[in-house]
Amino acid sequence: EVKLEESGGGLVQPGRSMKLSCVASGFTFSNYWMNWVRQSPEKGLEWVAEIRLKSHNYAIHYAESVKGRFTISRDDSKSSVYLQMNNLRAEDTGIYYCSTGFPSWGPGTLVTV
């Protein structure tokens, strides 16, 4: 069974930083691209960042709205993906989810700026 478990959210002041984590299980983590997405009432579901595989040199892509502020990373040995968020803004408020090529979602973690 594929499981994704996000953590690290909370209440943070504008301009501050926060790091989110996601632990995956039930599949070979190192074989899958990983994404962070977020959901808010204002913008709906919004893609945030993507990190590819070791064989792709861990290529990374970001949404324009977070480029230069957010950093995605992964640790295949821990089946985990991370999102370091700096210089947070009110518009970054939302529920953050990690996702991959399965129709499975974790509970998400709420970030309130």
Curated annotation (Swiss-Prot):
Q: Which InterPro entries is this protein grouped with? A: Ig-like_dom, Ig-like_dom_sf, Ig-like_fold, Ig_sub, Ig_V-set, IgHV
Task: Tell me the keywords, alphabetical order.
Answer: Adaptive immunity, Disulfide bond, Immunity, Immunoglobulin
The protein's matches in Gene3D superfamilies, at most eight in alphabetical order, are given as:
Immunoglobulins
List membrane-spanning regions: none
Q: Name one GO cellular component term.
A: extracellular region
Task: List residues of the Ig-like domain.
Answer: 1-113
Positions of disulphide bridges: C22-C98
Gene Ontology molecular function: antigen binding
Which Pfam family, an example, fits this chain?
A: V-set
Q: Which residues form a coiled coil?
A: none
**What is noted besides the main data?**
This chain was isolated from a myeloma protein that binds inulin.
Protein name listed in UniProt: Ig heavy chain V region AMPC1
| Protein's organism | Mus musculus
